């Protein structure tokens, strides 16, 4: 209500401010602008708030009242202009009545609204009749006065007064119309509030469902956020574990590389030592081989000398056996001397043979072979008998060939 009152006050102030005090301007104000403004404003209000079809609108009645009042009060020229404008406004009203109104068919046209509308129309008609009755004597007086000779200044003053009266009446009617429109707007707002409440009641289950869905969505979002935080924590822990594993592996690899380097160095040192030892052993073996080869040559020489000695001994034995029966007829004294000489020679020979055999055994021991058991036996006072004497003719045991390796043949 406050906003509508402000609008009405502003419009009234503007209308009052638009009135001029000069006598020349009053006629121009009385001709067309007020009537046009009122009719156009009434048409606008009628377009906003149209009555149901088949009923005359209050705005059209008010506009017609204003035009009739102007036609009775103003001069004939002004009346002609007002009639023309009235015809135009009537044509506009017919056009507005023929056009479909936007509020037709809406649920706002209830029984209460129709009753209030009819009541307002009755009030407007009564006011119209009262205005006609009050204006009839005034119009007669104006006609009488027009016949009389009136000065121009009084005519101008009367015109101004009449224009002011007409404007005040138009403003009062506009105020009434605005009050009516405000009441209609209030009713429409009430109806709209009722509709809004009904719609809210209809939409309340859907809103509850929306709230439920919103809660579910919020819980899901919270769960997703918690899962995302957990995944981020797991990723951080995995990254830290990977970094630790990489650091450990790098440290282990570095330690292994150091150990491998140290082991390589140690192995190279060991290889150098082994090479030195191998070279030393190889040199020693070469020296031993040289010594063995020399010893073998000496043994071969000794064997050859031994063979020669055996041959000599066999020859001497044969000579002794051959000479033995011849010496049987010699006296015993001579036999004793020969025997002693022969025994001495044999003892010397046997000593030489034993010395050679011992030297051969020593060489064999130094070479690592088993010494061969000597088949020669002799003593200082040994007496050879034919049954116990070995066969000196076979020299197969003493003439065995040496092997390629230079080792002495086994016994």
Curated annotation (Swiss-Prot):
Function field: Functions during spermatid development; may participate in the centrosome reduction procedure of spermatids and is required for the formation of the connecting piece/sperm head-tail coupling apparatus (HTCA) and the correct and tight attachment of the flagellum to the nuclear envelope.
Gene name as annotated: Ccdc159
Region (Disordered): 84-113, 372-411
Polar residues bias: start-end ranges: 384-393
Tissue and organ distribution: Expressed in spermatids but undetectable in the spermatozoon (at protein level). Highly expressed in the testis (at protein level).
Protein name, per record: Coiled-coil domain-containing protein 159
GO cellular component, one term: sperm head-tail coupling apparatus
Coiled coil: 269-305
Keyword annotations: Coiled coil, Differentiation, Spermatogenesis
Organism: Mus musculus (Mouse)
